[in-house]
Amino acid sequence: MSDLEQLERQILEDIAAAVDEQGIEAVRVAALGKKGTVSEKLKTLGGMSPEERQMQGPAINGLKNRVTEALSERRTELRKAAVAARLEREKVDVTLPVRESAASRGRIHPISQVIDEITAIFADMGFSIAEGPDIETDYYNFTALNFPEGHPAREMHDTFFFNPDEKGERKLLRTHTSPVQVHTMEKFAAMRDKEGRDEPIRIVIPGKTYRMDSDATHSPMFHQVEGLVVDKSANVANMKWVLEEFCKAFFEVPSVKMRMRPSFFPFTEPSVEVDIQCDRSGPHVKFGEGNDWLEILGCGMVHPNVLRMSGYDPEVYQGFAWGMGIDRIAMLKYGMPDLRAFFDADVRWIEHYGFRPLDIPTLFGGLSA
């Protein structure tokens, strides 16, 4: 066996014997470092004759390449083994029961729970969920919804505006989820015109909205849910039935009395506000009984101007829409006194008012059981 073969055998044995990356590095330095055994062999090439160099050069360089490859392979093996060992030490048995302590139990935030309850109810009535961007243009937030120039909502003290862009246009944080109604109508109108699919619209729109307001019952960021129906035969009777069914299901009562009061919204005509019967004599509001009335939501028939700007002929199509504050109805249903507590991230509050993760709301099993 030649000297090179003996040297290669010894180095490969040292590599195989290394048990960690420090050991591999020590072998590399001993073989390929400045004064390493393979490096010393390479240095001898300079003192050889051309004939000897031609014979020994490929052999020594081949040794260097094989040693380098063996070092790399062993280093990879050791890294994989280290990762596997760490995973074995840190593995968690996901089948073990959760520790029953207040600190370890997760809770669903009431806002998330109420959104799930609302969407479950409307999904049962054939509605789909629609969403849109929090940052909107003036057109979709105001103009397309029939807000005239000079309307108070367009003022800086009511709306969060961004600085104008290079074209002088200002975007804003949406003040309601209504822009999604316009986006959806435009989408369906385009589908009708291009593909001939004249489908009715039935959507519910939960989301965050923003206004410059902050007190015990108002927050600069709050949650709204709106609904929209557009069809050739949509009418006030349909709207009243949908809202009655929603109120009965959401407040979990067998029947509910509703009254509609004339109101004004730029995007609906006629516009009404809906009150439902309740009893406010105790610490918590009881719905479906008593002699009191409580405002729940606003609604109305979609204004002809809104239909027209969204691609619908108001002589052919009608629609109705409604909207309510998710935070407010959560407070009413579950007896929460201060809206600001929703956003304080107080673990004690979440523990008290939150819901268990597996309490998935369904109409069949009960919404908040």
From Swiss-Prot:
Belongs to the class-II aminoacyl-tRNA synthetase family. Phe-tRNA synthetase alpha subunit type 1 subfamily. SUPFAM superfamilies: Class II aaRS and biotin synthetases (SSF55681), tRNA-binding arm (SSF46589). Its cofactor is Mg(2+). Its main location: cytoplasm. Its EC number is 6.1.1.20. It holds the Pfam family tRNA-synt_2d. One of its GO terms (cellular component) is cytoplasm. Keywords: Aminoacyl-tRNA synthetase, ATP-binding, Cytoplasm, Ligase, Magnesium, Metal-binding, Nucleotide-binding, Protein biosynthesis. Mg(2+) binds at E269. GO terms for molecular function: ATP binding; magnesium ion binding; phenylalanine-tRNA ligase activity; tRNA binding. This is Phenylalanine--tRNA ligase alpha subunit. HAMAP family: Phe_tRNA_synth_alpha1. Coiled coil: none annotated. It is an enzyme of class 6 (ligase). GO terms for biological process: phenylalanyl-tRNA aminoacylation. The gene is pheS. The keyword Protein biosynthesis applies. Tetramer of two alpha and two beta subunits. CDD domains: PheRS_alpha_core. It catalyses: tRNA(Phe) + L-phenylalanine + ATP = L-phenylalanyl-tRNA(Phe) + AMP + diphosphate + H(+). It is found in: Cytoplasm. The keyword Iron does not apply.
